[in-house]
Amino acid sequence: MTQPSRRKGGLGRGLAALIPTGPADGESGPPTLGPRMGSATADVVIGGPVPDTSVMGAIYREIPPSAIEANPRQPRQVFDEEALAELVHSIREFGLLQPIVVRSLAGSQTGVRYQIVMGERRWRAAQEAGLATIPAIVRETGDDNLLRDALLENIHRVQLNPLEEAAAYQQLLDEFGVTHDELAARIGRSRPLITNMIRLLKLPIPVQRRVAAGVLSAGHARALLSLEAGPEAQEELASRIVAEGLSVRATEETVTLANHEANRQAHHSDATTPAPPRRKPIQMPGLQDVAERLSTTFDTRVTVSLGKRKGKIVVEFGSVDDLARIVGLMTTDGRDKGLHRDAL
């Protein structure tokens, strides 16, 4: 009488029939003599070590969680506790339906024989759920591919926060010694996306913490990077974003106005210091008089210059409200102000 098949953590025989399992403990001989796909002996190995004669490529095993260690180069540093609790509940009810991916550690003296390549969150949840063994695909992965594979899994699962993703990109650039274009081609992302994400690492540390915690979005962070006043101003605006609930669009407008005001003040400051001699614009009789009349009309500084082929009028304003006031004056009929071409 055939013995009933043993339940394999929610996976049954489906996955084991597709992925080689390698020789079981106590078996000898080359891998070509091991159990074949679909045979009655092609079962999973419960916590058995990987022999030196394992089948090349990926093999399927069920491994005790204690025999596995986390990936030290895991790009994701923040694990959502609520989502992890939901996964624990699901594993207790249905088992772990998707295996993790690990690589074998040769010569380990601590009892840990495998290292996670993909699936640290599932491994953590399986431990908390109390599983004796968890399904795993043992794959040969070199050190140079360990970070890349972990990064790609997290990107595809949308589990990295912007700062973790940026740090992982920078680490890949440093370790591979490649350009942004080459990295983009390797991991299937666009070069502008990689460049913009890495720029987030230039933010002040307190602002980075807000982004990592999800309090500020990547859009907010990119807007803050455009603030020219420096780190202190970026931290101050970040606090204001959180306190007032500013949208990304509102943040961008605030940064634009702040930069304009800083440039205006710098312009006035430069006006008090002697500037190097430069070519003077062509002057015509009455041109300065027109500039003064416009300045009086708009109650702001106005400069009028004339080049060889065309002239230019510059009307300065101090704020958005000031601009609206000036535009309102411009829409009125200027003939009563005596601004005729004959005045030139």
UniProtKB/Swiss-Prot annotation:
InterPro entries: Chromosome_partition/occlusion, HTH_ParB/Spo0J, ParB/RepB/Spo0J, ParB/Sulfiredoxin_dom, ParB/Sulfiredoxin_sf, ParB_dimer_C. GO terms for molecular function: DNA binding. Gene3D superfamilies: 1.10.10.2830, 3.90.1530.30. Keywords: Chromosome partition, DNA-binding. One of its GO terms (cellular component) is chromosome. It holds the Pfam family ParBc. GO terms for biological process: chromosome segregation; positive regulation of sporulation resulting in formation of a cellular spore. Residues 1-10 have a biased composition (Basic residues). SUPFAM superfamilies: KorB DNA-binding domain-like (SSF109709), ParB/Sulfiredoxin (SSF110849). Residues 1-33, 259-283 are annotated as: Disordered. Residues 261-270 have a biased composition (Basic and acidic residues). Was identified as a high-confidence drug target. Involved in chromosome partition. Localize to both poles of the predivisional cell following completion of DNA replication. Binds to the DNA origin of replication. Belongs to the ParB family. This is Probable chromosome-partitioning protein ParB. The gene is parB.
